[in-house]
Amino acid sequence: MNKFARHFLPLSLRVRFLLATAGVVLVLSLAYGIVALVGYSVSFDKTTFRLLRGESNLFYTLAKWENNKISVELPENLDMQSPTMTLIYDETGKLLWTQRNIPWLIKSIQPEWLKTNGFHEIETNVDATSTLLSEDHSAQEKLKEVREDDDDAEMTHSVAVNIYPATARMPQLTIVVVDTIPIELKRSYMVWSWFVYVLAANLLLVIPLLWIAAWWSLRPIEALAREVRELEDHHREMLNPETTRELTSLVRNLNQLLKSERERYNKYRTTLTDLTHSLKTPLAVLQSTLRSLRNEKMSVSKAEPVMLEQISRISQQIGYYLHRASMRGSGVLLSRELHPVAPLLDNLISALNKVYQRKGVNISMDISPEISFVGEQNDFVEVMGNVLDNACKYCLEFVEISARQTDDHLHIFVEDDGPGIPHSKRSLVFDRGQRADTLRPGQGVGLAVAREITEQYAGQIIASDSLLGGARMEVVFGRQHPTQKEE
């Protein structure tokens, strides 16, 4: 049973709709058909009884009672409403008169039928019916066709019993009128028989119509399924919001979910890219130190602190970026601690001197010890590390660092004697993946990360020309008042 349910119950919506609707139509059709058949049967019986009762009244009117005998004289031009066979009984059930002497018919009249007015039926065979229809050639032809199709077919004759009370001219009589044409040969009965075929044809016609209705009704769901497949194949980014009213809420929620997932994916991808870029400097220092150890230019005792410092920085950077990934987009600063700027820059300069040792970069700094940075230390190190690394990469020999501080802003200036940045590219270098010099190795990430961090401090980075002949980067950190609260 469970196996059957697993294989057959999870049907498609179209099949479910079709089966459910077909079931409803079938039940309603059968119900209406049964009601129609019962109604027709009752109406048919009433109509037949009324006609036979009319024949009975006619014979009662034409009957004469003389010398304790009854006689019936039928006019020659009398037009009977229907071919019938009439029998007249007295109150004791004795047969007084019969229109024709047909023994099997007389025996078929049950004594209990004669006790009350009523409507009955006599079941017989084709041969017996043929004796009743001896004078009706049209009915005989129809009966012949029935005999050819089924020699054992049963015929049903309607019987009406009417009791007439005694009067001055007539004793109590019971008149039995038998319809000589069986129900099976009547046109009305054939209509009844055809009703079943009409019902079956109706169902066969309804099923394809229901299929078309199901196909048309479920087209929006098919379209939605197709769009989902296109999403899986990366052929579309969002679901079409122009859909039916019932699916609008679902599509809107799915689009919101897709947007959230895409933003989260982009956030972590960006964070991973930024982390990879930030680890380049400490890894380069480790590589330079190991090279010095291999060439015996540095002793183990001197190399160990340098390597431990860079390993510690790598660990800090990983923790910092994981935390930053969870806070990205919130607009809330990680901390508002006070950090002297000069020591932080000294550590960066020391690391960069090791990275660019072969190039022989000369980095000079002119910063007052009182100048401080308010915020997360790793934010400052990340921004200035990227800006200084760019300056060292593109300078010829000299890099100069200076700073000034106002009530709410910290300005740090980094200048080099390199080729500088063309005016047309000064805004592009802060976009991810964009670089002013595409001939040198790089990813175009450092300055983009620096700008994103400074914007969190309501600051900016401004590129201009330096008096040294190269580029001048002005890094501005806002929100530098120690007592300032986040809005």
From Swiss-Prot:
UniProt-reported outcome of changing K186A: Impaired PhoP repression by high concentrations of divalent cation
Cofactors, names only: Ca(2+); Mg(2+)
CDD domains on file: HATPase_PhoQ-like (cd16954)
Effect of T48I: In pho-24; low affinity for Ca(2+). Confers to cells a PhoP constitutively active phenotype. Affects PhoP/PhoQ-signaling cascade and increase net phosphorylation of PhoP
EC code(s) of this entry: 2.7.13.3, 3.1.3.-
Entries under PANTHER family matching the protein: SENSOR HISTIDINE KINASE YKOH, SENSOR PROTEIN PHOQ
Membrane-side (Cytoplasmic) residue stretches: 1-16, 215-487
Induction statement: The phoP/phoQ operon is positively autoregulated by both PhoP and PhoQ in a Mg(2+)-dependent manner. Repressed by RcsB via sigma factor RpoS.
Classification lineage: Bacteria, Pseudomonadati, Pseudomonadota, Gammaproteobacteria, Enterobacterales
Binding site for a divalent metal cation: D151, D152
Localization terms from the record: Cell inner membrane
Activity regulation, free text: Autokinase and kinase activities depend on low (uM range) Mg(2+) concentrations. Phosphatase activity is stimulated by high (mM range) Mg(2+) concentrations and ADP at 1 mM. Autokinase inhibited by radicicol.
Name of the gene this protein is made from: phoQ
Domain HAMP positions: 215-266
Effect upon mutating T48L: Confers to cells a PhoP constitutively inactive phenotype. Affects PhoP/PhoQ-signaling cascade but no significantly effect on net phosphorylation of PhoP
Signal peptide start-end: none
Membrane topology: Multi-pass membrane protein
InterPro entries xrefs: HAMP_dom, HATPase_C_sf, His_kinase_dom, HisK_dim/P_sf, PhoQ_Sensor, PhoQ_Sensor_sf, Sig_transdc_His_kin-like_C, TCS_sensor_his_kinase
Native species: Salmonella typhimurium (strain LT2 / SGSC1412 / ATCC 700720)
Membrane spanning residue stretches: 17-37, 194-214
Gene null: resulting phenotype: Abnormal expression of genes encoding virulence proteins. Decreased tolerance to acid stress. Decreases fitness in the spleen of mouse. 10,000-fold reduction in virulence in male BALB/c mice (for strain ATCC 14028). Double knockout with phoP decreases virulence in mouse.
Reactions that this protein is recorded to catalyse: ATP + protein L-histidine = ADP + protein N-phospho-L-histidine
UniProt-recorded name of the protein: Virulence sensor histidine kinase PhoQ
